[in-house]
Amino acid sequence: MHPVNPFGGQQPSAFAVSSSTTGTYQTKSPFRFGQPSLFGQNSTPSKSLAFSQVPSFATPSGGSHSSSLPAFGLTQTSSVGLFSSLESTPSFAATSSSSVPGNTAFSFKSTSSVGVFPSGATFGPETGEVAGSGFRKTEFKFKPLENAVFKPIPGPESEPEKTQSQISSGFFTFSHPVGSGSGGLTPFSFPQVTNSSVTSSSFIFSKPVTSNTPAFASPLSNQNVEEEKRVSTSAFGSSNSSFSTFPTASPGSLGEPFPANKPSLRQGCEEAISQVEPLPTLMKGLKRKEDQDRSPRRHCHEAAEDPDPLSRGDHPPDKRPVRLNRPRGGTLFGRTIQEVFKSNKEAGRLGSKESKESGFAEPGESDHAAVPGGSQSTMVPSRLPAVTKEEEESRDEKEDSLRGKSVRQSKRREEWIYSLGGVSSLELTAIQCKNIPDYLNDRAILEKHFSKIAKVQRVFTRRSKKLAVIHFFDHASAALARKKGKGLHKDVVIFWHKKKISPSKKLFPLKEKLGESEASQGIEDSPFQHSPLSKPIVRPAAGSLLSKSSPVKKPSLLKMHQFEADPFDSGSEGSEGLGSCVSSLSTLIGTVADTSEEKYRLLDQRDRIMRQARVKRTDLDKARAFVGTCPDMCPEKERYLRETRSQLSVFEVVPGTDQVDHAAAVKEYSRSSADQEEPLPHELRPSAVLSRTMDYLVTQIMDQKEGSLRDWYDFVWNRTRGIRKDITQQHLCDPLTVSLIEKCTRFHIHCAHFMCEEPMSSFDAKINNENMTKCLQSLKEMYQDLRNKGVFCASEAEFQGYNVLLNLNKGDILREVQQFHPDVRNSPEVNFAVQAFAALNSNNFVRFFKLVQSASYLNACLLHCYFNQIRKDALRALNVAYTVSTQRSTVFPLDGVVRMLLFRDSEEATNFLNYHGLTVADGCVELNRSAFLEPEGLCKARKSVFIGRKLTVSVGEVVNGGPLPPVPRHTPVCSFNSQNKYVGESLATELPISTQRAGGDPAGGGRGEDCEAEVDVPTLAVLPQPPPASSATPALHVQPLAPAAAPSLLQASTQPEVLLPKPAPVYSDSDLVQVVDELIQEALQVDCEEVSSAGAAYVAAALGVSNAAVEDLITAATTGILRHVAAEEVSMERQRLEEEKQRAEEERLKQERELMLTQLSEGLAAELTELTVTECVWETCSQELQSAVEIDQKVRVARCCEAVCAHLVDLFLAEEIFQTAKETLQELQCFCKYLQRWREAVAARKKFRRQMRAFPAAPCCVDVNDRLQALVPSAECPITEENLAKGLLDLGHAGKVGVSCTRLRRLRNKTAHQIKVQHFHQQLLRNAAWAPLDLPSIVSEHLPMKQKRRFWKLVLVLPDVEEQTPESPGRILENWLKVKFTGDDSMVGDIGDNAGDIQTLSVFNTLSSKGDQTVSVNVCIKVAHGTLSDSALDAVETQKDLLGTSGLMLLLPPKVKSEEVAEEELSWLSALLQLKQLLQAKPFQPALPLVVLVPSSRGDSAGRAVEDGLMLQDLVSAKLISDYIVVEIPDSVNDLQGTVKVSGAVQWLISRCPQALDLCCQTLVQYVEDGISREFSRRFFHDRRERRLASLPSQEPSTIIELFNSVLQFLASVVSSEQLCDISWPVMEFAEVGGSQLLPHLHWNSPEHLAWLKQAVLGFQLPQMDLPPPGAPWLPVCSMVIQYTSQIPSSSQTQPVLQSQVENLLCRTYQKWKNKSLSPGQELGPSVAEIPWDDIITLCINHKLRDWTPPRLPVTLEALSEDGQICVYFFKNLLRKYHVPLSWEQARMQTQRELQLSHGRSGMRSIHPPTSTFPTPLLHVHQKGKKKEESGREGSLSTEDLLRGASAEELLAQSLSSSLLEEKEENKRFEDQLQQWLSQDSQAFTESTRLPLYLPQTLVSFPDSIKTQTMVKTSTSPQNSGTGKQLRFSEASGSSLTEKLKLLERLIQSSRAEEAASELHLSALLEMVDM
């Protein structure tokens, strides 16, 4: 084994070679404890010495040629042993002896004070030997040390130097770890450089010097000396060489395993790029576009031709070239020289181009490019002009002085640069000012202030945060402003402001950011090691970029770091890649990573090495699926990255912190993208880990819903999505994987209902359904794949059912169900889904919600998605069903809606109804067709309590599909030990799976055994052995502690074929071993002796010192610990005593405080109570006083008002009384005055009259004696009876006057008589005016109908009675009009005056004679008062009061003279509203005539005014009324004028009564059978007859079935026509239950009844049947036919009848074929064309017609008549509109073509039908009353069918005889079969002709003619003999053709009657058997 590094604990010495002298061994003082060791650090005398021996050889360059002397040397590194306090390590240095400007080599220099050994073995070619233009063999010779040059080996990140004419050479590396440190590998390189004259080579053997922080330091330029004083590392080498610093075991350190397969040409190309590296940034994933071509040649050309090569700075390294694992000719050294020469040849060709690259520094510029601190480490080459030996010595002195700087300064600078987040100070051009007052935080003020200091570029202010950002044009200005800008305010604090660089953007070139003077800044230490195969990883500051990144959307882990996923290739490629991979990965072992970010960077570096070591496959034949090896729920690297990025969920952190809980972290989902790299095996989880992850989610996460549902759902969804992605990437398909996808599906199904009420930001139902669909699709494919393998999953039926439930709206989902496996298709889950599909698509919401209530929880969650859809459709159906028209509304109870549609409560139902436009009030919903809305989108779904109750177990058990599994216990894998050192467990577990190897090479194996003694066992015990057979890495390989484990560790999982290379020269292993042994022995012979002796002494001293130090440390530590423990105990005891005292004091104070508070509270309570009572009393008293004052004031005011009012009234009354008395007095005085005058005038007139009588005008003729007597009154008084009887009046002296009394009496009698006559005349007129009309006579006389029973219905529309008084003319007119339409013999209804209702006034049902016939007259009079209310309208529509109305009569109210215009318009509007209400409440068809009665004489313009006021023309145009007239009637009813006009109006209404509907009535069965007979039988039997006559095969069954189903569909459309819904028929008052031929029942045209009729008619349809292929075997065809016929019967009891008939038919067909066939085989049978398909369909149709049962009971019981029949009503003219389907027409055309072909072959020869027996045709049943006509018509049709094909008379007799023979054969066959059945049943039935006790209704309704034939005896011989006699009689008689046709018709009818009777009897027998 390799000895422990001898330089671990003592001061090393240094051996250095200068240009002129050799030094001596010199010892320095001991080093400082804790100081890291660095390569090339020149220690001061107080620090350390260097121990170095550099065997080297060199050839000085001569002339002006530029030569590079490759060195072949061995460098050994030392690692810190027990103590890590070494300040320095042995450094190896050599000076360059070349003075040529282009001769650049790496040299290790030391100060003059450092001594060196004089013994340095050098070997190499002689100086000055020149090879011509060719290549010659190199000679080896020892040269003095002053000519030796040490050429360090550059790594992929440390590019070699290159001068103007120099190209870096290629090299090989043989490496092995040395020491117990981090395990670096020793490079073994063969570099070579050629030029035009000299070819030289040298070898450098170097061992790795491992320590905690070994690094190369970059030299310092003269211009930046002050800046480089802060650099922590030391530089070594000449001015022409530059090394950048590296951390522990970094790729650039000695001991780095440099890849041998990286040619020098690529190094030359990368040199141009490495001069100016891009700024550090977060690493982006590699783009596939960038990975297309990675050849070194192409990359070099791109580097040379690209004008801006810095833009390619973020490209990953090129792919490693492919090397075949094959033996090569020549020796090892010869092959090496050849390859180096070839690479240098190509490099020389591109040298001129590379010299123009911008990456090289011009002469005079700085030595190296400045890379910001800590971001990356590279070896930066530079090109410097020629320097002399004096300049080199002066530079060495400066460097040595700088090497002694304190490490503390370097640490401070490193920390400062690290705090900037990996950003160079040169890029900091902005400052950030905080704590700025608001009045100063203004852009103008800040710009003005800082413009005085430097030139400001832009200013950003944020007053809310009291900060501002000021950008300057350069770093110097920003630094000056940061220094002097604090004068703005005393509280202002200024910091640097760093830009946040997006990881998706490329970085700008460094030279655009920096000036020439700034480009020479030194490279800082890199905090991480970097892979030699990839770009360095940038380490951004954890506290800067990460914490200040945008919180909106953080980049995902796998999105930022896209990985490739190709496994390591096999063969030589795999060997080469594995070798370099293991070599590179071994350098990572032991690296310390303290923080999570450092650990992530280290693991990411490991992944990049592994990813670049693999070879991508482009051959699909060799492609294979990934195999995951991740043992944890989340890969380790992702855990560290997400903790760094703060991308952890609340379920993945340690409670109370933001640190990741490694046991609870679950892999996050990463969306796939085009530029994403393929995953590595350890990034994918195998099936077992995925199952454990799912078990963890189910048991630990699913039921955690205490926090945010959004976080819970996002976490579970994301992690299950990641599980699905891992399954997809690994192409897993097994039952375990299926169970994982099933659990994901259950989770999404549960969330579909559970999360439906969450906002869109938390839960998106659409995305959830998409994921559910993807899961179900994956399951469907996996089920199919596993079924193909013979594996059946137990849950397949469950999830296929879920798939169907998810796609219920998909049209072809049933087709997919038919494709399921029979076990799955017939499972309860799939059957349930099919039932849900049927309920949803048929809008059967009752069935749907019943299924929801009976469903499982997950099924109910899926059905919940359709709740809004089914509810909307159900609401639409209810709205249409419960409303009559669009203008009417219907009230429906809200509780019914909640119950039927399964709402949670009334509130949810109300919201849903309001969303669809319906209003809810008082617990009822108002259904209205016009108000119903159908929004475009569905309303927001809500959770259902009914579904929630089904969740009886935890969510985890629901998702798991059963009881929860045990909680998974697993300890996550960690690649770091307790000291945070990388130990590489992941590497040990991944490489055996992902690495492929072709085979072992004996030589390589031997080489590994030879160097096994030098392997560091403790460090590399976990490393795998690299493949020793790789020709690309002929170096010393690493071998683990157990050699036996190496083969298994590197054994390939699969061994792909390797193409055999072309034959090449073969060299043996002995040659290789010999050459390598010689080289190693010669190079190490002297060096190993010195190193071993010094190492032994060092180890001895170190052991002694370490023992003493350990004892001292243990003693000191123990003493300190004991003292600390004792002090703590004492302090704790004192603290306890103090706490007890304090608690006692606090308790005492607390009690005192409580006592004081109690007393104080009591006092305050008493005071507050007293104060409160006082305030309340005062307030109460004030209120009472105020109230009393107000009351007193009101009383006084009232009293005063009363007194004033009384005084005023007294004054007013006194004045009024005075005026009244005055006026009365004046009137009385006037009266007295005139009365007195009148009295005086009367007295004067009397006096004058008396005087005139007493004193005549002339002297009296009597004497004087008689004069006095003459003046005395002499009239007779009293009058005597005698004079009175004589008619005389004695006037005395005046004489006697005769008076006639009889004339006066006669006049008196005449007057009295006239008065009586007039009185009775008026009374008769009044009686006549109030007498009812003789409506039956008027109707029978004027109704234009010819039916024997006539119906007429009139609706009187009267004004509102509430608006008129009982004695008003309008009220009298209404009563008069009611009386006119009330008959004496009528059934008078409830005649009331209630407005807003329609009442039956009278109903007439009498017989009336018209001419010589008597008709039944049925009249109904309805009356409506005023406008109807909504409830009255609903009652009218519900009770169908207006159904069958024949006319309307509207009475207008009388016009009042004082009526204003507004009131008149209002009366018109009221009448119009009343009229429109009635017109809209009745069915729309037919339109009715209208009579408008106008009271009083309104003048000539009354008709025009009525038309305009009622808008009668508009009503006519709208087809609401058919016609109208305006009739003026008197406003009084004293004469017959009104009666005459009303009678005329009634006659006009009757004459214009709507025409009678052409409705036909039949029972449902009769209607179907007549339709089938009319439209199907005639066509079908005619086609069958033609095809049989032509010996053609039967018609295809699908065509016959389609014709039959088409006829049924036509019949269903006729009987359920939409025209029937709007018909106003029958008259409701005369309708009967069950209906009749004249009057149907009330619900005959309701939509529900018509829909039931349509469904019932369609129930006769036959299922479709396709014709089997022509070559189908007989038995499968028979099975298909039997299976088809089993679908026809409606019950299992009638199925055997049809089955036996079909089997009998098939047996006869087979027997017929067997008789025709000569030698039939057992497996053969009749062909498909020979099967009588038409007869099979005929049997099915016959059975369907006999065995049909209605689908369910009718909607209304009124549809059933007394005998149980259902009558249907239809328009007869619609039956003529049937169109034959296209398939039947095509079949008929095909038949005609075949007939033509048949006739063409056989000429006019008639073809006799076959004599085989076939079933009878369809049973024809007809309507009662049309039996004879139908029978005769059918007979005539049959005759026409027989004669249709004959055109000549000579063919007539033959056609007739053929038909008779056919009928005869059919009769004979049937009678034989019947006799056979009767003989079998003779024991059970004594009389075979007796009918059974029960007969179907279809058979009972046979025509009478057929019933009479049923009594014919069933014996066959009498019938046959009678038929034969009739036939012979027809043949013998020489009667005419007409008589023959008649005889033929009679025979056919008789034959059919016999068949029907036999069929009837047979059916009866079969039904009795079934009973």
From Swiss-Prot:
Protein name: Germinal-center associated nuclear protein
Localization in the cell: Cytoplasm; Nucleus; Nucleus envelope; Nucleus, Nuclear pore complex
Region (Disordered): 1-50, 214-406, 1793-1840
Tissues expressed in: Expressed at low levels in lymphoid organs, including thymus, spleen and lymph nodes. Up-regulated in stimulated B-cells in spleen and Peyer's patch germinal centers (at protein level).
Signal peptide as annotated in the record: none
Organism: Mus musculus
Modified residues (Phosphoserine): 424, 502, 531, 550
Summary of the function given for this chain in its UniProt record: As a component of the TREX-2 complex, involved in the export of mRNAs to the cytoplasm through the nuclear pores. Through the acetylation of histones, affects the assembly of nucleosomes at immunoglobulin variable region genes and promotes the recruitment and positioning of transcription complex to favor DNA cytosine deaminase AICDA/AID targeting, hence promoting somatic hypermutations.
PCI domain sequence ranges: 768-951
Self-association and partners: Component of the nuclear pore complex (NPC)-associated TREX-2 complex (transcription and export complex 2), composed of at least GANP, 2 copies of ENY2, PCID2, SEM1/DSS1, and either centrin CETN2 or centrin CETN3. The TREX-2 complex also associates with ALYREF/ALY. Interacts with RNA polymerase II subunit POLR2A and with the transcription elongation factor SUPT5H/SPT5. Interacts (via FG-repeats) with NXF1; this interaction is not mediated by RNA.
Compositionally biased intervals (Polar residues): 8-29, 38-50, 214-224
PANTHER family tied to this protein: 80 KDA MCM3-ASSOCIATED PROTEIN (PTHR12436), GERMINAL-CENTER ASSOCIATED NUCLEAR PROTEIN (PTHR12436:SF3)
Record PTM N6-acetyllysine, positions in chain: 483-484
UniProt-recorded Gene Ontology molecular function terms: chromatin binding; histone acetyltransferase activity; histone binding; histone H3 acetyltransferase activity; nucleic acid binding
Transmembrane segment boundaries: none
